[in-house]
């Protein structure tokens, strides 16, 4: 009897506590994830560069980072699980410097690397297939790599390429076409473009007919200012036929009244969609952009429509500091998708045109020291002490971040002087002042960069492109401080990477981060020259290069708490690659592909 009572008593206790136990277990079980990636090599780029196996993502954020076994605890009925099968995962690439609107237009049509008429015709066919009738085809930039026996991309040629406009005449009959050589020494047009300015391209007396057309526009009072047919040379072949090519100072003014000053909004929308597709296939999940205000509006429009597949850090010009301040914009303004609060200024020119500012003259042009930009000079081009500093002081006082272009050694030194004065007048604080490009730095200025807490916003692929002619222009001694990434890092400055996409009219800088990583760790051209690397003591490790392309750019944007590494609570932005970047040679980087890009927990590239 006692045993039966005791058994009943125990059964009652068990029955009463079992629901409690199950409830406790449910409380301990995590909410299901939307997506789990398992069995990978997950390089987190956290404080200790942890390598792990899996991540779980919910509502666009990482909720778990760790072992594949533990990740499966986040599996629910609707959770998608992807077996990575050992593939390499790292945070999405954060590009520190792009000109997105220009890149979007460049992607639409460019023949910078075209070497044959077949390539030219194929690219014309492609752009025609994507444009509504009547839209102008512009851009081009042919011949940029003809000047090199072997360009940094291996695409250099000895024979000059000139597009055959007659070969695309039928293709482009519904599209006026006005394209340019990379140095603006020559232009090419089709018949539709000529007709747009009242010129009959079939007239055997073409210059005479063109002159008559211009005179008629003068009589009608519709001639654009500066139009002058006398400044246009119509190029002909050996048989005397017009080739479609033009030269001369009057070419631009001849077409100024008919070429659209800006693309339509719909065209820019489509260009942006195409450019977003381009960057996500290379694992880029965040860009720092210096485009116009319409581009910012387009980002917002796409975000509202759910089509924005990259995060945007947007930078207007430094001269607009008061406008930004009056609108209440400061560091941190915006949200996780579109962030404002930084401004872009310029100190000097660029190496490509020998306008970067140096203490000593250029080795190949000793009287030329380069040029200061407009915010540094008066209306006559004379240097004005303190003019640029005034902009810095005011913008800084308004709570805005400054990012300033400086390339030559004098430009970088002067900018560091200004930063020291900024600290003296406005006080020392966490500004994360971004010294943009920092291409050539004097030996004594590296320590100052670290002491001042500078963020060096560099684009390593510039190195692979520029090393071909750098010593010719500034000599070997000054070149020791060119793209000196190791010296910058060792100084204590923060090194962050990007591309300067799409480049200039003379050089293309692709958005592909693998090219920048390759340049930073090898210091070679893409053809592998020189064998040991150009000033190889300035090479950095792969882990440092990856950090510069991920976490450090997030830090530069004041966003390291929400992005830049694979950690719980951060936004789920990542890239899955075909190769383990930590275990391959620099050359293998050039064959490494991105098989999946995830932004905010959504797969935007790959399966």
What are these regions (language model features)?
Residues 303-306, 329-338, 426-428, 449-453:
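Acidic (Asp/Glu)-rich catalytic clusters
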Residues 393-403, 410-433, 437, 443-447, ...:
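His/Asp/Glu-enriched, well-ordered alpha-helical/loop segment
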Residues 99, 337-355, 453-464, 522:
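Non-cysteine beta-strand/loop elements that form the S-adenosyl-L-methionine
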Residues 24-25, 602:
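Boundary of Sec targeting at the N-terminus
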Residues 1-6:
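N-terminal secretory signal peptides that target proteins for export/translocation
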